[in-house]
Amino acid sequence: MNIRKEYPKVCLFLWILGMCFHAHPILAQSVIPVPLKMEQGTGSFLLSEKTKLYTNLQGGEAELWENYLKALPVQLKEARMKDRKQMLFLLITPKTPQLPSPESYTLSVTSQRIEIRATSGAGLFYGMQTLLQLMQPASTGSYSVPSVEIEDTPRFAY
């Protein structure tokens, strides 16, 4: 075995191994499409079987979201508005300056809760897609979501 031939391979292997274990920050460019506004916070939310779901959706839209959420890697329990910890909120709200179009959404992640607000189901869908991109496996059956504040709206009308 010639050490000169093996040395570059060993160095490359150790560099790759080190990159695998290095925690990479979530950048706006990591989310596709790139959100209009994204602010990284500190800490993260642990999405697990203990996470509860609260939504103000009703009727057919609520049933549609119930089926959609069954596809998540974590099954969520229903909650009441008074519950405050380990919560995922999906909320339809009136139109605001932060939510100018039906496809706009805000996504807020703290260590206690995840909140997606939109003026329509389409906005909630896009917010959920962004949340799925941010989820990173943490331990068996749970996912870590970094603390972040995102406001997004389509740049072009469809």
For the regions a language model picked out, list residue spans one by one:
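Bacterial Sec-dependent N-terminal signal peptides
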Residues: 1-30
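Contiguous, structured surface segment used for ligand recognition
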Residues: 28-158
